[in-house]
Amino acid sequence: MWPSDAHLALSLVVNVEEGAEMSLRDGDKGPEPVDELGVHLKIPIRNFANESNYLYGIRAGWPRVEAVLAKHGVPATFTAAALALERAPDIAKALSGGLHEPCSHGWRWVHQFSFDEARERDFVRKAVDSIRATTGQRPLGWLSRYLHSPRLRRTLAEEGFLYHMDDFSDDVPRWDVVETDAGPRAIVLVPYALDTNDMKFWLAPGYTPEQWLDYAIETFDVLHEEGAAAPRMMSLGVHLRIIGRPGRIRAFDRFIQHARSKRGVWFATRLQIARAFAAATPAPAEPAAT
């Protein structure tokens, strides 16, 4: 299924959310609740401390992450909230070169699952238009902030998305068929992973860099071994404000070093993975439209 009969497709996912998180400055009812210290303010005031923590991801975290990717010459999928790229043009420019892929993480990094259908569709379209304008690439994949509505996948198919990554159900992609106004359409589910995500540094009991690296390498080694019998994929998700800290960035570097030392590994964007899967696996027979 993978090029050159690779055992494992390795997907590095860089989340770009900083500058698009919840904030009173952008009209939200309260400040961003996701905080390294787990501080959840109950009153509607600006949390300048956490805002600066997110800004760290842009100012200091991004250069470190960019340097590690450039050192190894490997591609990554950047799941980006569109507004974050508008406010960080250097990152948007880095996604215009063709090596990396921009994937839509929404117009802003907010919960859209409660939106009505019209607002949700506008949210999707606004994200697409913005990312295309800042990077020169039209995003063909989507990742929500945690939850999504039952109709989102249908909306994505109707809006021309190739794949959806709000799924954690397997170690390989699969097809889904959704009913649209134009009839049934197939969309690729490219599963993501939370267990290898660097959010583990922020969630109690927080991982040390060594614990996170050990877990990521163990995951890689098992999937790489299994891939000799049947192709596998692995996702490693990181955030600029988290892995970009000086005490953590070497764990990211060392993981990539380990993966590059093994044969039969295909470093790929999620779009490349979705396309390879779709080329090798015919879409399921679509039921007749009713």
Segments and roles (model prediction):
Residues 1-188, 213-236, 242-290:
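Catalytic alpha-helical scaffold of carbohydrate-active enzymes acting on polysaccharides/glycoconjugates
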